[in-house]
A protein has these predicted regions:
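Donor-nucleotide binding loops and adjacent catalytic segments primarily
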Residues: 197-273
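Catalytic binding pocket for nucleotide-activated donors in carbohydrate/polymer assembly enzymes
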Residues: 285, 289-329
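A conserved, positively charged/aromatic
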Residues: 100, 128, 144-154
């Protein structure tokens, strides 16, 4: 192996939820100029049509059939991932092994729990060994697919998650608390100050695909509050589905509602707003924490997102508000007494925010790569 070339880091991700891709991109950006990194989605590359069907199915079930999803999620606790039984994943594993062989990485990083099992079988089949790092994109409540992963290290989002994994008998020396690897730009941005007067109070809203919840949620935010509130709605992939409804809000509340489509400025938007409302996905929750922006959870996916909500509650920076009345009441509570509760949440977030987490994770990966490159190759 030539030590004259930059270290090579293969970062494997998946599109089942935004957290995996957000973590992969954040780490890759932090590695720029220090390593040759390749971000790959093995599921997308091996079977793009089927992968798209499965992703859409995942979003549908988690949005409209949460109880069904919880049963699926809980069943994973008893699944043996060391044996490959799904034909679709066999094709993915074969394609991934070929990519590993071509790229010849010094370290493999996975932001999705299944890929370390692929790497283990690849090495057992004669592939070149290299360190395996798993970035756990959930918090506190960690699924068996992550915990049983045959990895050298788990990078986790916070102290509570590390403690949770240690309690479940994972080796402490293999659990590295780096924070969620958000975009490195967070470390350069200035959040809304803790002592901001919050007038008008700017709310950033990430709606789900559900048409039935958008208007009631917006009304709950915009009406019957102690002082002026402005709303920015980021539609993202739901732009076509929800745009006509959001236009009605723009007309109903002149100069108080803004619409964003697919935005690359999410870090900046989070740092410009006083509150975020959305689902409790790992990406949104940890980006909100990095931006010191309190959060109200309007949609909770049972299972993996329950730990993210618990983390917000332990920090003292957010809570669940799934109905219109609950959301309106939570917002009034934040804004009462000159927004004293909001100011307290901002202060709590300032003690827990990790806007440089991706650089911390990148430093760990680079150190691991250096050790691997300096070690003699196994016979």
């Amino acid at each position: 192996m030539s030590l004259s070339r930059p270290p090579r880091v293969l970062i494997a991700t998946a599109g089942f939820g935004d957290g995996h891709n957000t973590a992969a991109r954040g780490l890759a950006k932090a590695l720029e100029g220090q390593a040759e990194s390749l971000v790959t989605d093995p599921c997308e590359e091996a079977a793009p049509w089927l992968n798209n069907v499965l992703r859409n199915g995942y979003r549908f079930v988690t949005t409209y059939l949460p109880r069904t999803w919880k049963r699926i999620y809980n069943s994973v606790e008893h699944h043996d991932f060391s044996r490959q039984k799904i034909p679709f994943m066999r094709n993915v594993e074969t394609a991934f092994a070929a990519q590993v062989k071509r790229f010849n990485p010094d370290v493999i990083v996975s932001t999705y729990p299944l890929y370390p099992y692929f790497v283990e079988r690849y090495i057992k089949g004669g592939g070149r060994p290299c360190p395996m790092v798993t970035i756990v994109t959930d918090s506190i409540e960690i699924n068996a697919s992550w915990r049983k992963s045959p990895t050298d290290f788990w990078l986790v989002t916070d102290r509570e998650t590390k403690s949770s994994l240690i309690e479940q008998k994972l080796p402490e020396q293999k659990i590295i608390e780096t924070g969620f690897p958000v975009d490195p730009i967070f470390d350069k941005l200035s959040p809304v100050p803790t002592d901001d007067h919050a007038k008008p109070f700017r709310v950033l809203y990430f709606p789900t695909a559900s048409k039935s919840s958008l208007i009631p949620t917006a009304h709950a935010i915009l009406e019957h509050q102690p002082w002026p509130v402005e709303l920015t709605i980021v539609l993202g992939r739901n732009f076509r589905r929800l745009y006509h409804l959001t236009r009605k809000l723009v007309d109903a509340y002149p100069n108080r509602v803004r619409i964003k489509g697919w935005s690359r400025r999410v870090p900046e938007l989070l740092c410009e707003h006083h509150l975020v409302v959305g689902k409790a996905g790992g990406a949104t929750v940890h980006e909100s924490i990095a931006a010191c922006c309190p959060m109200l959870i309007q949609h909770l996916v049972p299972g993996q997102e329950e730990g993210n909500l618990e983390l917000l509650r332990r920090i003292g920076a957010g809570d669940l508000a799934e109905t219109g009345p609950a959301l309106a009441a939570a917002l009034r509570d934040l804004l009462s007494d000159r927004a004293s509760h909001w100011h307290r949440q901002k202060h709590r977030l300032s003690l827990h925010a990790r806007p440089a987490a991706s650089r911390v994770a990148a430093g760990f990966v680079l150190e691991l790569a250096a050790k691997a490159r300096s070690s003699p190759a196994p016979n």
